[in-house]
């Protein structure tokens, strides 16, 4: 695709999702919840400015009384023939689950954009992991994962195209804070490309299915008895089977346009790798750095990124795993008490059994819960652990577990050399440090023709807490989705911090 068909802008993940989703949304039902709130705010702002979607209309935005109300409004809009979208996270997503089941059964093209966040259990955490996403895996909704801000820009509109053509609800998710609030300079595909990909016949068929007593009367959402309900549910297998094909079709078209690889599962690493990590979310960007570094040192390692989590395609996973692989570590960003393994790990184990690769040793581990930082040394330690004399599933990485002793040893001396410049700013909540750094990194990214990245860490307090601004910029793409540890420049706003 010619370069003039792209535009470049420094944005965070939430902004990229809002821009992408607005194109194919007719009704947006919203309710704020951290860290997804900016998506809804941006869509509301675009609508108030009179911005047109791909259909030439201004999006109708309705703020509801809760996330349950937002999902109900989406359901009603879809039944009435409007393409509807919502944005949420954490407990808000849980409140939507009853309606998600209905959207799936009624084959409605709802789209949820989720900045994945921890669920409140022993304590409340507003920070990111994927517990909320995994709670939806049994609903039957299609689930698409973006691993970076750039991928959000590419896959947010793709999620809508899949929903429309496959007549299925789609949950498009990415890591809360680490990706939703990270700023990167992003390449946006221009609107004409997306309009050309839209299946207009599918849109027309969806409109025809709208509940309308005047000429298109149908019965929907009735009650069935035991003599027929089972058969009807199984008959939907034919519909569900086409979702993977539709997703693959759009993955391929976006890959061809951008040069960025998209598929249900994407492999990165040595073609003859013996050790592979499987994960989804921002940690895969860090893993790319580690795999690249270890390959230079002669190690045969690889990474599999999960883009299509549901439906989970055994066929595509088997085709992605190199024949040489002997050991796999599956990393889950959640903890599911009482289970014999975390969700992605169990999916991979079952897939390997179905695919005839029971020769592969598989270990499952947890990382990054509640936005716990995952550094390159942690990924390196996972590869090392696969070769350890004593291994176990259920390991943790990134913490020192001195209670249940499930954490694995970490090589504290491991580090990756980078050519970019890194900066670390310590500030006081509401003192303007974060806002100034957001402006600075956008100027660098938009005006200096350099790659730029910014991430901001702070506690749950609205003001008065410690803030840390992690800035990086350089001549090469930046995949460092972790805190700056060895900064070239450090700023401190308060003497007391020193």
Which residues are covered by each model-predicted region?
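Conformationally flexible catalytic loops at phosphate/diphosphate-handling active centers
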Residues: 55-59, 170-266
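Peripheral docking tails and interdomain loops at the edges
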Residues: 327-416
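Anionic-ligand anchoring segments at beta-strand to alpha-helix junctions in alpha/beta enzyme folds, i.e.
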Residues: 26-63, 271-272, 276-307, 419-486, ...
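Terminal amphipathic helices with adjacent charged low-complexity linkers/tails
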Residues: 173-214, 319-356, 363
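Glycine-/acidic-rich phosphate or pyrophosphate-binding loops and their flanking alpha/beta elements
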Residues: 10-16, 251-275, 288, 406-420
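A structural-propensity feature for long, helix-poor, extended segments
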Residues: 65-67, 122-141, 317-336, 456-494
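Conserved thiamine diphosphate
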Residues: 126-176, 200, 350, 354-368
């Amino acid at each position: 695709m010619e370069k003039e068909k792209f535009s470049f802008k420094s944005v965070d993940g939430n902004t990229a999702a809002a821009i992408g989703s607005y194109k194919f949304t007719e009704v947006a039902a919203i309710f704020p919840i951290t860290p997804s709130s900016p998506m809804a705010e941006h869509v509301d702002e675009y609508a108030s400015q009179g911005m047109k979607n791909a259909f030439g209309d201004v999006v109708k935005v309705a703020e509801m009384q809760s996330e349950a109300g937002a999902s109900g409004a989406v359901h009603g809009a879809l039944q009435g023939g409007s393409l509807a979208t919502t944005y949420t996270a954490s407990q808000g997503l849980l409140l939507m689950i009853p309606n998600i089941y209905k959207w799936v059964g009624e084959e409605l093209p709802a789209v949820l954009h989720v900045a994945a966040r921890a669920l409140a259990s022993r304590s409340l955490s507003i920070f990111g992991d994927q517990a909320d996403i995994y709670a939806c895996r049994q609903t039957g909704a299609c689930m698409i994962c973006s691993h970076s801000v750039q991928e959000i820009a590419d896959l947010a509109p793709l999620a809508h195209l899949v929903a429309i053509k496959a007549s299925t609800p789609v949950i498009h998710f990415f890591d809360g804070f680490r990706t939703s609030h990270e700023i990167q300079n992003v390449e946006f595909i221009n609107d004409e490309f997306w309009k050309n990909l839209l299946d207009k016949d599918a849109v027309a068929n969806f409109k025809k299915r709208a509940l309308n007593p005047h000429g298109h009367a149908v019965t929907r959402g009735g009650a069935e008895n035991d003599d027929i309900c089972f058969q009807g549910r199984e008959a939907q297998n034919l519909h569900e089977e086409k979702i993977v094909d539709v997703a693959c079709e759009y993955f391929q078209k976006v890959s061809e346009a951008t040069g960025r690889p998209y598929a249900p599962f994407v492999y990165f690493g040595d073609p003859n790798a013996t050790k592979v990590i499987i994960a989804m979310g921002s940690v895969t960007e860090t893993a790319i750095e580690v795999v690249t570094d270890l390959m230079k040192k002669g190690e045969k390692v690889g990474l599999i990124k999960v883009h299509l989590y549901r439906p989970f395609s055994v066929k595509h996973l088997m085709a992605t795993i190199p024949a040489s692989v002997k050991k796999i570590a599956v990393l889950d960003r959640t903890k599911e008490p009482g289970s014999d393994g975390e969700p992605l790990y169990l999916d991979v184990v079952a897939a390997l059994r179905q695919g005839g690769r029971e020769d592969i040793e598989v270990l499952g581990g947890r990382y990054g819960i509640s936005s716990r930082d995952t550094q390159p040394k942690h990924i390196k330690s996972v590869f090392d652990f696969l070769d350890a004399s004593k291994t176990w599933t259920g390991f943790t990485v990134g913490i020192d577990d001195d209670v249940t002793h499930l954490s694995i040893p970490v090589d504290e001396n491991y580090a990756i050399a980078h050519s970019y410049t890194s900066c670390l700013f310590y500030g006081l909540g509401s003192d303007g440090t974060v806002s100034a750094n957001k402006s600075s990194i956008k100027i660098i990214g938009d005006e200096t023709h350099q790659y730029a990245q910014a991430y901001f860490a702070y506690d749950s307090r609205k003001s008065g807490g410690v803030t840390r601004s992690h800035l990086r910029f350089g001549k090469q793409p930046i995949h460092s989705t972790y805190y700056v540890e060895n900064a070239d420049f450090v700023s401190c706003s308060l003497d007391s911090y020193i």
